[in-house]
Amino acid sequence: MARVKKKVLLIEPNYANKFPPIGLMKIATYYRNRGELYGDGWEVVFYKGDLKRFVIERITDKLIEKLNDADGTNRDWHFHKDILFEYVRTRRTELLDSLPVTIPAVSDGEKPVKNIALLDLVNEAKDKYWKKTWEQEPEWDRVGVTTLFTFYWDITIETIEFAKRLVKDPKDLMVGGVLASIQPRELSEVTGLHIHKKGQAGGIHIGILRAGDLDKGDEQKIDELELD
């Protein structure tokens, strides 16, 4: 049986900058390499933007998988992703009229009926977002947040606090970068995160990442890795 991949989410706060997050790109390479080097491959996802939209996107993607499995036709629900996303985001019931959830009449005189099973899946996804039950089922084994300059303090803190809701265990939330290296103790006081200890991925990382910083015994020199 194939081993289930762990998942790591790498986040750049929605900074107004155009430079690529080099640190996160090297960390992405690190995690992708672990599959070949140590046999524990990771699924790596990078995100920059509105994290609420990210949550809705993930809920919608899982909804599409369920709809494709439950629908008895050859329909591909990916073609309806935009409408599904908007319904989960807004709860506007008129959007349901644009979805193919009607079972055609099989004989003259019969009226088409709604496919309740499909509608239930759609509404479960909507409720998962609005009732915040997604917070009870975090998807990510590790989450990393990069930081820039101190004048981005507010958005950095907001991102870290949101990231706590995405990771399965808060001790596996990694924060690094410029601000984390300049003001680690101030960041620790505000967020409650500990200063990083070698061999434990989570915490506030100061300076560059070295071999063994994220996983004990891993000999990859992270700062020297190629960009993903």
Regions found by a protein language model. Give the residues of each.
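A short, structured N-terminal alpha-helical element that caps or precedes a catalytic domain
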Residues: 1-190
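N-terminal [4Fe-4S]-dependent radical SAM core
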Residues: 2-8, 189-228
